[in-house]
Amino acid sequence: MEDNAFTGAYSYNLDEKGRLMLPARLRVALSDTRLVLTCAIESCLWVFPRAQWDRFSSQISARASLFHAPSRAVLRRLIAPAQEVELDRAWRLFIPPSLREYAALEKDCLILGLSHCLEIWDRARYRAYLAESEADFRAGTETLQDLCL
């Protein structure tokens, strides 16, 4: 994903083995089939290409202190649960059971492209999140008011 960015929203079903098909439009943004999955902040999963994860986790580790309780919480919730997986020949992403449980992934999933990473949501949980986060979205757009569009 060096030059290309992840974008779009894609509905896919998790198969009985815990695998999720990676959409063709997202595959072109990958330069490597190794991906790192971890718990995200809003009860979903983040998916990073391996090189992007290395940069992201290094930045977190460089700023975190084991003597600072909030830093330990970030390390425990973002770094510790991270697992590397390799896409199979059919471009399926295996989601380990512990991560499926964290994000409540059973069947109906949504894959979101967030430019530098992907999010994987349970579809119903994402709809609920959208309803709950409208005020945050509006506040966030106000921080972008200096953009020239």
UniProtKB/Swiss-Prot annotation:
Residues 9-52, 82-125 form the SpoVT-AbrB domain. The keyword Repeat applies. Its main location: cytoplasm. One of its GO terms (cellular component) is nucleoid. One of its GO terms (biological process) is negative regulation of DNA-templated transcription initiation. Keywords: Cytoplasm, DNA-binding, Repeat, Transcription, Transcription regulation. One of its GO terms (molecular function) is transcription cis-regulatory region binding. PANTHER family: TRANSCRIPTIONAL REGULATOR MRAZ. Belongs to the MraZ family. This is Transcriptional regulator MraZ. It comes from Treponema pallidum (strain Nichols).
